[in-house]
């Protein structure tokens, strides 16, 4: 049998990047990109092993951020800018988890989209 040449995947060395924290009411997703915006790694509360309503807890957001930070340090990342989007409960805990994992947080930016009276919002919950 002929040998097939497989290209060896080279892991890029990226020293600084952007951590996008998307915190919804149901889940928290942390995506780490380089300065251009190309995704390096990501993690969410669901991929961290949480199911159902536990995904919306601050601890689940913390675990997702820890997992994403561990993957990012394999790329050689040291400095990170954090962009937070959404009203979820995992926002602050995700930022502190990124700092605790050894990433140097340079900037925290709020990028939650706020409508200037755009679409009609969903109806209020009555519990």
UniProtKB/Swiss-Prot annotation:
Transmembrane segments: none
GO BP terms: translation
The keyword Ribosomal protein is annotated on this UniProt entry: yes
Gene Ontology CC, one term: cytosolic small ribosomal subunit
Gene3D superfamilies reported in the protein's UniProt record: Ribosomal protein S11 (3.30.420.80)
A GO term, aspect molecular function: rRNA binding
Keywords, sorted A to Z: Ribonucleoprotein, Ribosomal protein, RNA-binding, rRNA-binding
InterPro entries with a match to the protein in the record: Ribosomal_uS11 (IPR001971), Ribosomal_uS11_bac-type (IPR019981), Ribosomal_uS11_CS (IPR018102), Ribosomal_uS11_sf (IPR036967)
Pfam families referenced in this protein's UniProt entry, alphabetically: Ribosomal_S11
Subunit-structure text: Part of the 30S ribosomal subunit. Interacts with proteins S7 and S18. Binds to IF-3.
Stored HAMAP family: Ribosomal_uS11
Family that this chain belongs to: Belongs to the universal ribosomal protein uS11 family.
Role: Located on the platform of the 30S subunit, it bridges several disparate RNA helices of the 16S rRNA. Forms part of the Shine-Dalgarno cleft in the 70S ribosome.
Protein name, UniProt field: Small ribosomal subunit protein uS11
Encoding gene per record: rpsK
């Amino acid at each position: 049998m002929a040998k097939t040449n497989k290209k060896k995947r080279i892991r890029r060395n990226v020293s600084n990047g952007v951590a996008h924290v998307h915190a919804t009411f149901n889940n928290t997703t942390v995506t780490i990109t380089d300065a251009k915006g190309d995704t390096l790694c990501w993690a969410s509360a669901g991929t961290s092993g949480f199911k159902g309503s536990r995904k919306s807890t601050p601890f689940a957001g913390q675990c997702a951020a820890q997992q994403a930070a561990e993957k990012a340090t394999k790329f050689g990342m040291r400095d990170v800018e954090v962009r937070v989007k959404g009203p979820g409960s995992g926002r602050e805990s995700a930022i502190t988890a990124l700092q605790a994992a050894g990433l140097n947080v340079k900037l925290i930016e709020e990028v939650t989209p706020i409508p200037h009276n755009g679409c009609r919002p969903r109806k209020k919950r009555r519990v």
